Amino acid sequence: VENGQYPFFTCAERPFNIDSYAFDTEALLISGNGANLGYINYYKGKFNAYQRTYVLDHFSVNIQYVKWALKVLLPKRIAIEKSSSNTPYIVLSTLADLKIPIPNNSKQNHIANLMQSFERELSNQLALNDLYNKQKQYMLRQMFI
């Protein structure tokens, strides 16, 4: 739904929109099949999810720490376990059986904050790179009018 009120998470990297929500929580959403198999989104609030998108919520540890741990550990697990059918997919046990080391809260927070800082900086640098590319294209067009 183009002007839907709530994000609708599918196996794509970016959510679509929908008019109804099924969840009102803080969650990690993991693509369970297709080209983006294992892609992890984080969301807090009201949303809906496609049937092949795993919704992980109600964490007793730092959810951001878990997100970063999954970004490292899940691709390795997927490489071993994914189905090689026409559409690759994972099953719930792929996630449930994953062993994530859980350090103390202080270390979890430190790791999560550090990774979020790197992610923000990377995002800023990518945006700056995009601006430089646009400026370069503009200047080239001006030079060859």
Question: What label would you give each PLM region?
Answer:
Residues V1-G4, K82-S83:
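Short coil/turn segments at secondary-structure boundaries
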Residues Q5-Y39, K44-T53, D57-F59, V66-A79:
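Short Ser/Thr-interspersed hydrophobic loop/turn segments at strand-loop and sheet-helix junctions
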Residues F47-T53, S83-S106:
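A short glycine-rich beta-alpha junction/loop motif
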Residues K99-I145:
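Amphipathic alpha-helical coiled-coil/heptad-repeat segments
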